[in-house]
Amino acid sequence: VENRRRFLAEAAGSSAATLVTLRQIHSGMIRVVEADDLERPGGLQTADGRAMLRGDGLMTDVPGVMLGVQTADCVPVLVADVKRRAVAAFHAGWRGTLKRIVERGIGMMRLRYGSRPEDLLAAVGPAIGPCCYSVGEEVRYEFESQFAYADELFSEVYDSDPVRDKYPLLFLTARAPGHSNIGPQIHLDLWEANRRQLLDAGIPAKRVTVVGECTACAVYGDRKKYFSHRGESGFTGRMMSVVGVANRFA
């Protein structure tokens, strides 16, 4: 609890700000936070401080509310309407990206708050990059069925083995009958996939910032810079990305 107060004081300039988070479920579900939600006993948290809302997107126009999404490889996307004072936060793994959670979220902001894409600022935060994010063929198939530009999101990466590269015939004959050669890994660019959704929603490219740092391999000095579920084999923490509406008189 004390750590959360310090975080709010740093991010919002006031520990009195209200932080709203989600029980993230890798969905396309987006929840709207209204002033009435915060007036209920306990607000949007359980007695032990856990998030009550399930989903992977949040939006609000309530002053003093901070929206947070937690990631450790998935993509955090933050959006702010600087004219209508509304914000949104999205947690986009490959499933949420496939469900167009970011693109749909911008549409919801337009309907609910009257947001215009040209007034929005968006940030695609640190996430696992195309350098490290290998996926199965079934994921590529799913994206190809949904996005006309899917080919631009995938690359094929071959492992380099000096011995195998020098003596390829040795490795061919060593494989059991019926087994093919070692094929390439398929890598997915979630940064670009979510940037494209922001552009498709009408936000000008110059108003979209992509941090472009990979959570699995970025370093700071001699240490890993970010938590990474894949880079740390599932034993890791979580980062929180936050956006909110400032209290005019704070």
Name these PLM-found stretches.
Residues 1-250:
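Active-site microenvironment for binding and transforming phosphate-containing groups
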